[in-house]
Amino acid sequence: MTDWTPKENFMAVLGGEIPQSVPRYNMGMKTMNGRETTRGVGPSILRKMDSHMSPKGGKDIWGVSYVANEETGFASIPEPNNFILDDITKWRDIVKAPEIDLDIDWEAMAKKDMEDAEIDRNVTAVYSSAMLMPFQQLVAFMGFSEGLCALYEEPEEVKALLNYMTDFYVPIIEKTIEYYKPDCYYMLDDTASRYSTFFSKEIYQDIFRPIYDRLAAPANERGLPIGFHNCGRCETFLDEMVGFGVKWWDPAQHDNDLLGIKEKYGRDLVITGGWEVQLMPSWPDVSDDEVRQTVYDTVDKLAPGGGYMFIGGILVRPGDEKAAHLHKLVQETASEYCDHYYEKH
């Protein structure tokens, strides 16, 4: 039998089918030597205006300063105690949408951006993104304390701010989908800790759901499957997410009732993840066999019946040879075990 490509397995599971292999999701990053399940693309005109994902930190397109360090694998966060907005009612004086010429040659830009990305579209699915993380952007402007207070004290001002940013992004999202022709669409917003959501379902429905609806609309109107990245115990919000078109959810951390979620949604919501180092109580004093077993156990728990993709790894600090070894071990074990899983089980 011919081996399915990562893209074929990925698109099959999003379509509610049983794939040949359990897809190994990579969140769009170039990490699998050209055999990635997904890769993200987007207009370079925005990337040139945004430096906040740099290993040295920088500013996002809204003027928020970010910092990064080696302990986080150079993942960036808003610079502590350097927030640009301390009063949500004053956002109109502070937050200014960048000026972008929507009449640029989108076809030429898309052609060059796709060539630069070096993606084999027969092997790898391409996604475009929503570009805006509404809650995360709010706390990037204000910090967690002030941002959460604003949700309760000035909900109409928060709505106005989020709609202002959405007004900026939606035309760009529509142009991106039109010219880059992605296979799917990706949204992100972390709204929970490992213990609970940061705010109530009522606030989600009142403030955030209308924004997510607007951000999802360009994909839904074109029939693109939607993924959503939401860390933590966010199961309270899954009905809403499915309601605006989400087909896969990552990283599906084990603090959620994953088996209950799988039973409730079946293949309509693809659980993507379920593995993390907290599964090993003795971490980091673990053997290779223990690490391998956690991968086997996670896949065997969540893959039967379809509706599942594996994602797992260890954030590696530069110079930490043990963490690097274990991260590689997780990837190799998952690759071997997920390959042709549904033919072997």
Predicted regions and their residues:
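Short, charged/polar low-complexity linear motifs in solvent-exposed/disordered segments
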Residues: 29-30, 41, 84-86, 245-246
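Intrinsically disordered, low-complexity, compositionally biased regions/tails
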Residues: 38, 44-46, 67, 77, ...
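Short acidic, Pro/Gly- and aromatic-enriched capping/linker segments at domain boundaries
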Residues: 42-59
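Active-site loop segments of alpha/beta catalytic cores
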Residues: 1-29, 68, 94-345
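Short, solvent-exposed polar/charged micro-motifs at secondary-structure junctions
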Residues: 32-38, 55, 62, 76-79, ...
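Short, basic/low-complexity N-terminal boundary segments at the transition from targeting/disordered tails
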Residues: 24-46
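A contiguous, low-structure linker/loop signature
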Residues: 55-103, 119-127
